[in-house]
């Protein structure tokens, strides 16, 4: 029997992941089945975090618009996810957390089953997802004060924090030897952009700071590669039909 608890967020998150892979559930209406090596696919090869690229990765990058559909985030008046203590993301000071997953602490667990958070685990590995590392003092003012479409071509590597000497913001154009290194106060040296990016000159890592989790095989022993993945895709479930009907009734 599967474990589920209304008060245990980890159990709810794991239960939903298990549901994605339960091809024998009596709720299933339409399941697309695969079998390695004859009828395999490459979903993990195209969408897994960058540390597993075989040879591709990060093809599906969930956006903030998608995450805003889930309850539990602190929000601005316009409904967008709050990242500063100001009235919008361009003023005030950045909110600080003890870990990258802190911003997701109160979010409904099903989002965690859909996407991989920075600092969360997949296939038994901690996913070191970060665009850069800031070494300046706190509080931290927003790097941009205008996030409108008109200024969308301005990048973080054009900000004063990155261009000044000594710089306060470290970012990497690519993985491997292209990584900028940051030495922490305790003497530890880390990669500025982690193992999974985003990297500002490599589009194969996530472009949004989030990776998809749904249907990625969590088994560390499973194969990753084009034509090597064999997990089934549950295209329709009975519960989904009921929820769609309820949503349609509300929206009519």
What kind of region is each of these model predictions?
Residues 1, 30, 107, 111-116, ...:
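Extended, hydrophobic/aromatic-rich amphipathic alpha-helical segments that build helical scaffolds
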């Amino acid at each position: 029997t599967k474990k589920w608890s209304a008060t245990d967020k980890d159990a709810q998150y794991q239960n939903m992941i298990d549901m994605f892979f339960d091809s024998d559930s009596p709720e299933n209406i339409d399941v697309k089945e695969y079998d390695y090596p004859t009828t395999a696919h490459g979903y993990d090869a195209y969408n897994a975090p960058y540390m597993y690229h075989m040879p591709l990765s990060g093809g599906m990058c969930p956006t903030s618009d998608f995450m805003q559909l889930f309850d539990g985030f602190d929000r601005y008046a316009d409904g967008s996810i709050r990242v500063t203590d100001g009235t919008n993301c361009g003023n005030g000071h950045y909110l600080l957390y003890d870990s990258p997953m802190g911003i997701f602490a109160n979010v409904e667990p099903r989002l965690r089953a859909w996407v991989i958070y920075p600092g969360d685990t997949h296939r038994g590995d901690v996913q070191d997802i970060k665009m850069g590392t800031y070494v300046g003092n706190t509080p931290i003012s927003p790097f941009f004060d205008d996030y409108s479409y008109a200024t969308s071509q301005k990048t973080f590597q054009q900000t004063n924090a990155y261009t000044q000497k000594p710089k306060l913001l470290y970012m990497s154009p690519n993985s491997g030897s292209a990584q900028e290194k940051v030495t922490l106060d305790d003497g530890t040296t880390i990669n500025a952009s982690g193992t999974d990016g985003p990297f500002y000159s490599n589009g194969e890592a996530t472009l949004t700071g989030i990776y998809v989790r749904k249907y990625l095989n969590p088994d560390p022993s499973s194969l990753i590669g084009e034509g090597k993945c064999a997990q089934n895709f549950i295209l329709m479930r009975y519960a989904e039909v009921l929820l769609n009907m309820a949503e349609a009734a509300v929206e009519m």
